[in-house]
Amino acid sequence: AAYGKILPKELLDLPRFGCINVHASLLPKFRGASPIQHAILTGETHSGVTIMKMAEGLDTGDMYSQASLEIAGYNYPELSERLAKLGAELLLKTMDDIESGKAHAEVQDEKKHFTQSGKCEKNSCGCGRRKWPNQLEPDIH
């Protein structure tokens, strides 16, 4: 589920380990509100989830862990479900590692495939069947 708001630092610092987020992409690729849709629309063959410490920016926090899977041939609902399951499993493991002191957060490499995925509006993201350049109409519904 996308939230799309930037929380103030005072709130992010309240929990003992900070606020932890599950993001449905391999950050820093596809930061933002619609990473799954953008992965489908740009023809990615693999994507995944990132467990990260939240920061004041939009999906800019340090990363604790990532896991990937093949996404070719899946539509949005199917992929969303697969990534949610993968994210839940990785979150449990990562939280155990954070609590035990085994986890180490890694700064996102801004030079490594940084992309921003804005909101997926009905007419801007293929949801309204608009064709993207050099793309067949992917089934993101």
Locations of regions flagged by a protein language model:
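Alpha-helical oligomerization interface recognition
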Residues: 1-50, 54, 60
